Amino acid sequence: MTQPVPRLSVPAALALGSAALGAAFATGLFLGRRCPPWRGRREQCLLPPEDSRLWQYLLSRSMREHPALRSLRLLTLEQPQGDSMMTCEQAQLLANLARLIQAKKALDLGTFTGYSALALALALPADGRVVTCEVDAQPPELGRPLWRQAEAEHKIDLRLKPALETLDELLAAGEAGTFDVAVVDADKENCSAYYERCLQLLRPGGILAVLRVLWRGKVLQPPKGDVAAECVRNLNERIRRDVRVYISLLPLGDGLTLAFKI
């Protein structure tokens, strides 16, 4: 049975997480003047368009991407559905948060080519472990040579089965409360179930990241019959009301929710 990793106190862990987000604002992920109250003012203060020169400047002055990670990102973008991959700025923020809380164990739901798994693995110590879940065996094999090139393959534990099965197996094996970070970027129909199980597997002070929580803007008014959009909208409301976590929903990529377990 896997032993729980040493736990930071909840206030300390949350303070660290807050510090990381503050650093992200300070170093350029969020530009412009001090953000106004969310109601009643028209001042624009968040992100420039991703195809703008200002956005490219932002990335060029903030990104520190491992060569193998960059190669894997470019390779992934060439694949069908490659644009659904975690963005480089999301990956770097999550990796920095993992370093900040001295993470050793991570969950990654939705491997694809393993870009997010590799980003996390590179942030963990030599004895760290990333359990990553995928149902299609082909995409991870595209990324495996680059996991090896980055000398991080030994940290990546690929589970080729439905993510819910892997999560239930981890819980049955007594690993509840032993993971430091969890990233959810899998099918949206099961996103609420993923959230609940990941929260059980996280230790207090652990970080749960949910990607694509804006679902191309469809969460505002899910189209009739769009089950995925409805599920994402419901999860957003669920997390907003969840007293077990502190949250931030960030406008990075297609939306990134960070939930810090209390």
UniProtKB/Swiss-Prot annotation:
The protein's role, per its UniProt record: Putative O-methyltransferase.
GO molecular function ontology, one term from the record: S-adenosylmethionine-dependent methyltransferase activity
Subunit structure as annotated in this protein's UniProt entry: Homodimer.
CDD domains according to UniProt: AdoMet_MTases
EC number assigned by the record: 2.1.1.-
Family: Belongs to the class I-like SAM-binding methyltransferase superfamily. Cation-dependent O-methyltransferase family.
Name of the protein this chain belongs to: Catechol O-methyltransferase domain-containing protein 1
Source organism of the structure: Homo sapiens (Human)
GO biological process assignments: methylation
Cellular compartment(s): Membrane
